Swiss-Prot record:
Organism: Equine herpesvirus 1 (strain Ab4p)
UniProt topology in membrane: Single-pass type I membrane protein
Protein name: Envelope glycoprotein N
Keyword Signal in annotation: yes
Keywords: Disulfide bond, Host Golgi apparatus, Host membrane, Membrane, Signal, Transmembrane, Transmembrane helix, Viral envelope protein, Virion
Subunit structure: Interacts (via N-terminus) with gM (via N-terminus). The gM-gN heterodimer forms the gCII complex.
Family to which this protein belongs: Belongs to the herpesviridae glycoprotein N family.
Locations listed in the record: Virion membrane; Host membrane; Host Golgi apparatus, Host trans-Golgi network
Keyword rRNA-binding set for record: no
Amino acid sequence: MLSTRFVTLAILACLLVVLGLARGAGGDPGVKQRIDVAREEERRDFWHAACSGHGFPITTPSTAAILFYVSLLAVGVAVACQAYRAVLRIVTLEMLQHLH
């Protein structure tokens, strides 16, 4: 019967062989260099002035202010509804305790 130590060493040796073969089959080093250069160019050209024209423009102060106040109103309504629900549950609980 094989010992667990021998099996562990065999599995480790197989993994090392597979990793060595995978590293050796890396391919042309020029391809990796070209990919790195392309990624560097993409990092430099990430933002462009023409890109800001897409979507919903919020660069004007009036649009940004309207969006801010609508969002603030929505958050305020949500907080008020949750507070009303909490108070209603507390009052209901107190009333049920006084009935019994």
